[in-house]
Amino acid sequence: MDSQLACPPNVFNYIESNRDEYQLSHDLTEIILQFPSTASQLSARLSRSCMKIDHCVIEFRQQVPINATGSVVVEIHDKRMTDNESLQASWTFPVRCNIDLHYFSSSFFSLKDPIPWKLYYKVCDSNVHQRTHFAKFKGKLKLSTAKHSVDIPFRAPTVKILSKQFTDKDVDFSHVGYGKWDRKMIRSASTSTIGLTGPIELRPGESWASRSTIGPSPSYAGSDQGDAMHPYKHLNRLGTTILDPGESASIIGAERTQSNITMSMVQLNEIVRATVQECINTNCTPSQPKTLQ
């Protein structure tokens, strides 16, 4: 497969690393890239510039027997991200395939931080012993600086296959997608009146069901996000009998308590007798006898 690059690499514009041998490993192992010198980085830092990778070329040259099997995985990571989100681009290709990998950066980085990009490789499902020096890697970097970052048009990674026995059907490569973003509403007087962060205020002639249909944006209408934020927004289409919640929990609990009281006739007679006796003792006092003078 021919390279899809518009401009082939020019060695005079690229910083080249040494073509070094690397041992076969089933775990991710770093490929050392040559970055600008400390003096160059300091000069760019003093000029308050930021930097990006315009183009990165990773050359892979295999040195294994013709019956060697397995796949090589090469990954570029951005260490500004968390470990599980740092992967930016990856390639897979046969271990016997001589190939050039091409990568284009989509972001700037500050020279006040360490250079964030790291390059790794590993070999999967191979019949070659581990720690065998199975290939040579060489990196070429073209970087640029700017006074401030700007939007960079996305350019997909690509490859140039140099071994004639392999085609584009034997390789694969990918790039990470754009990060997802959800709008966060700001708490204000307007948001408190539409029921997002404050209670819904019912006005004359309105019901809870109709007021709860108010959302932050018409774009949420009919969407899963809108349904999640306003699960009762369609209640106003139901009749009042369906919306009636029925008796409260306290009334139901009281009725259950009353219905569970059981008493025998002897206990009931004893309560009545004690009650009557108490009333007599309290309200019925005997009159004092009159004496004759």
From Swiss-Prot:
One of its GO terms (biological process) is transport of virus in host, cell to cell. It is found in: Host cell membrane; Host microsome membrane; Host endoplasmic reticulum membrane. The keyword Zinc-finger does not apply. Phosphorylated. It comes from the Viruses. Residues 209-222 have a biased composition (Polar residues). GO terms for cellular component: host cell endoplasmic reticulum membrane; host cell plasma membrane; membrane. Keywords: DNA-binding, Host cell membrane, Host endoplasmic reticulum, Host membrane, Host microsome, Membrane, Phosphoprotein, Transport, Viral movement protein. Residues 207-228 are annotated as: Disordered. The keyword Phosphoprotein applies. One of its GO terms (molecular function) is DNA binding. It is a peripheral membrane protein. Binds to dimeric supercoiled plasmid DNA. Movement protein involved in the cell-to-cell and systemic transport of viral genomic DNA. Begomoviruses use 2 proteins to transport their DNA from cell to cell. The nuclear shuttle protein (NSP) shuttles it between nucleus and cytoplasm and the movement protein (MP) probably transports the DNA-NSP complex to the cell periphery and facilitates further movement across the cell wall. Belongs to the begomovirus movement protein BC1 family. This is Movement protein BC1. It comes from Tomato golden mosaic virus (strain Yellow vein) (TGMV).
